[in-house]
Amino acid sequence: MKNVPYLSAVGAIMYLMVVTRPDLAAAVGVLSQFASDPCPTHWQALKRVLRYLQSTQTYGLEFTRAGTAKLVGYSDADWAGDVESRRSTSGYLFKLNGGCVSWRSKKQRTVALSSTEDEYMALSEATQEAVWLTVRTRRTKG
């Protein structure tokens, strides 16, 4: 593992996340925060993610064809999850006919003063994505 640069390994995991593995979004977000100066603890976390990948090689995205498009979305946030900055991480996931079509996990730009405010900020980001996906789906259907 010493021959593989930390940033390259995180980048490879990020590629998997973007292409086929939304379950890696939170882990990539945390690992990438320490890319400039990883310590042994960060390497251990990276190895843990790689072991997870090894044990879940058959996981991936699955799409089904259906007559009507059904878009379902989920959003969540952790209030003040970053101990140093007290900023929250919010995320969302959207499924179209059961298959993931959009997902994101991102540290919020502002500090939420309550868990309710935190959840509303996450919901706002998810709603913007839902509107875009709805318009896109309608245009695709013609």
UniProtKB/Swiss-Prot annotation:
Residue numbers covered by motif RxLR: 48-51
Leader sequence residues: 1-27
Claim: NAD is one of the keywords in the record: no
Alphabetized UniProt keyword annotations: Host nucleus, Secreted, Signal, Virulence
Location within or outside the cell: Secreted; Host chloroplast envelope; Host nucleus
Keyword presence, Cell wall biogenesis/degradation: no
GO CC, any one term: extracellular region
Assigned protein family: Belongs to the RxLR effector family.
Domain remark from Swiss-Prot or TrEMBL: Has the canonical translocation RxLR motif, but lacks the canonical EER motif, which characterizes most oomycete effectors identified so far.
Function of the molecule: Secreted effector that completely suppresses the host cell death induced by cell death-inducing proteins.
Protein name from the UniProt record: Secreted RxLR effector protein 161
Species, as recorded: Plasmopara viticola (Downy mildew of grapevine)
Lineage start: Eukaryota, Sar, Stramenopiles, Oomycota, Peronosporales
Gene that this polypeptide is encoded by: RXLR161
